[in-house]
Amino acid sequence: SGGFAMRPDIRNNERVVIDAPALAADLYARVARAVPPTLADPRAVGANERFRCYRYRPGQHFARHYDGYFERDSGERSLLTLMVYLNEGFEGGSTVFHDLGVVVTPRAGHALLFQHHLLHEGATVHSGTKYALRSDVMYSAR
């Protein structure tokens, strides 16, 4: 993925990147009511078609981090992370926002929206396998 190198001290999960514009449109239609229509100046225009598919096996995690943004050639830029939890049947693997004191327990089919600048982590999976799909909400160029 274009010079991207995972640091095992930060994350040791597995990841596949796919581009799926039709899936992005369908996903956005399902979550649009929960998306802030504007953040400062720009307005929401849809979901990012670049999906990151994550698999976490026992012992795998994603340490505290901020999510990076995605920018299109048009100047549209992601401001929100859109995480969809794909399964249950594992222990651990919560999404933790330490500064906010919030712990999100993954539930199959549920989505989590949050601003990229919020420090968070994917806690260690203790048993079973966790699957999640990450996209972003794209906003118009400023």
Regions found by a protein language model. Give the residues of each.
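Fe(II)/2-oxoglutarate oxygenase catalytic core
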Residues: 1-111, 117-142
